[in-house]
Amino acid sequence: MIQLEERDMPEIPGTILDRNETQELRLMVADLLGRRNPSFPGAQPISFERYHLNDTLMNKDYYVCEKSDGLRCLLFIINHPERGEGVFLITRENDYYYIPNIHFPLTNNEEKGKTYHHGTLLDGELVLETKNVPEPVLRFCIFDALAINGKDITKRHLPKRLGYITEQVMKPFDNFKRKNPEIVNAPDFPFKVSFKLMTSSYHADDVLSKMDQLFHESDGLIFTCAETPYVFGTDSTLLKWKPAHENTVDYKMEMIFKKFQDPDLDPRDPDSTYTDYDSKPELIKLRVWKGGADYEDFTKLSLENEDWEKLKNLRQPLQGRIVECRKKLSDPGFWEMLRFRNDKSNGNHISVVDKILHSIQDGVSEEELIEACPKIGKAWKKRIYEKSQGSRSSYSETGRSHPEPNREDEPASKRTKIDMEEPEPNGFGGSTTNHQNASKQNSGEFQDIPTYEDSDDE
């Protein structure tokens, strides 16, 4: 039976820009990142497969966070010489929205006047918090950065990128909130801003155990490699885990309706046949995207009579809509619909669909993931030990008996404080707690979470 899930999806609290303004900003972003292509630069994950559990997470350092069920956006901040500070949200469709009434200071000290970012590009998710809260709250959760104040940092590894967010975005913004509560608590302040909770991959079990404490919907986990740069477009090291039965595909829906012949008219008359749009379609094709405007028939949607009535009662256009579907357990040859994807103009590309199908067939269950966490942790600590031994050997050969530690090789728990004598940020500052947990974490828990606590009172 079709499941038209009623989900409270966030709405962007701003004004969409016209074509000329959008193109100007697209080119500005491309230039900032050293790209010729002005397309959406955000990284896209691939589906988690069994070899990622048995091989990838055992051999590489990864951080994990919950996968928010919201609206993926990039946040772009500039300081125009004539128009002043501009804050924009960029959707996956590469549309730009101007966000008014919000300020991101560049420094902690604005006593002598406001300071402004120019050329800061952050990756995140706009979520609507409706769980465990008295009233809905719109929040932008930052989880990565592409550029900070005109500096392209995509070549940096994840710990460095998160360090930049902590020192040059979250700390100044948090200080601004503390000093200006009347501004951030005003009705026209567009949304709250937070740094998404992350932890090392072997704590995935802890993240899963606290999913029900989140204030927003979440439908899985995201594993981000700590040893690789930020990748534009599909990133084969960025992993999206969902339980096998919750893996979904976005298709384009095409309905084939019955045609009837009017017995009172000549069959040769073109007006003698009509399409019955009121009755349930004979067939609903699910079409897969092959790029550009090219789609091909791929599979079929299961639809009961009561499901059709439910769709009709929506009184919305149905033909050609992008729909999120999952395989029907009772009939693997068909799929069932979960919801419309109004935020997407195309379905998943066929190459992505192939990977999702493989992930469904060879999926990793939540129990298997939890069971593997101690092994992942042991492998992580073994890598740290082997790297430290290698560092000692190399320093011994040069006659140094007390080598300086390589900060990039240390576990996250050893990099939670930034050495301010370094020329640029590295590691993570602030507390290891986060607003996303409905209850405060106990002392000693999640000691290696690379995140930052804002000053919200929730």
Curated annotation (Swiss-Prot):
Reactions accelerated catalytically: a 5'-end diphospho-ribonucleoside in mRNA + GTP + H(+) = a 5'-end (5'-triphosphoguanosine)-ribonucleoside in mRNA + diphosphate
Domain of life: Eukaryota
Active site (UniProt): 67
Enzyme class: transferase
Main localization (coarse): nucleus
InterPro entries in alphabetical order: mRNA_cap_enzyme_adenylation, mRNA_cap_enzyme_alpha, mRNA_cap_enzyme_C, mRNA_Capping_Enz/RNA_Phosphat, NA-bd_OB-fold
Protein name, per record: mRNA-capping enzyme subunit alpha
Species annotation: Debaryomyces hansenii (strain ATCC 36239 / CBS 767 / BCRC 21394 / JCM 1990 / NBRC 0083 / IGC 2968) (Yeast)
